[in-house]
Amino acid sequence: SQAGDDIVVAGDGDNIIIAGSGVDEVTTGNDDDIIFGDNAKLTFNTQGQPTELLSTELDFGDVDTIIAGDGNNMIAGGRASDAITTGSGVDLVAGDNILITLTQGTASQTIPTLMTPVDDIGGNDVINLGAGGAFVIAGAGDDEVTNAAGDSVIIGDQGTIHFAANGLYANAFTGDVDIVGNDTLTGGSDSDVI
């Protein structure tokens, strides 16, 4: 519950960053990163691959800035009003707190099966997506999501995304209609579901 204001700069490679509850700035290079702006618990299989990413200590969190490079990133801003920017790649992005589950894919990779919020508190997030496609649950608050390119699924408030066995989304639906905000959602140059 107590944390400082961190500046984290990570280079290329598959990075795992849990910034904690302070006002944090996180910048990563290319490759596949897992980034939580606030607190989280991560579960791995015996091969060292992630199987569950879960936001924790939900009452604590602050304003974070997250800039991720190219690659297939999984990012959660956390409780407060966060700014998230991604590069090229197929990204999973949550403006607030989130649960992401994954299953065994190839020998070196797991693929997502579920993405859903874990509480009803969130800030006014600004999410800028690069090319490549993304799956976004902006969450509570007045959020702004802008997609550059790539076939993306964007939910402005609460919702859940289920994925098929190949990692492509199978269905997406909105959540609690009482948890809403005045969101601005802008699609890119390809086919988006908003």
Where are these regions (language model features)?
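Short, structured motif recognition centered on aromatic/hydrophobic residues
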Residues: 18, 36, 76-79, 94, ...
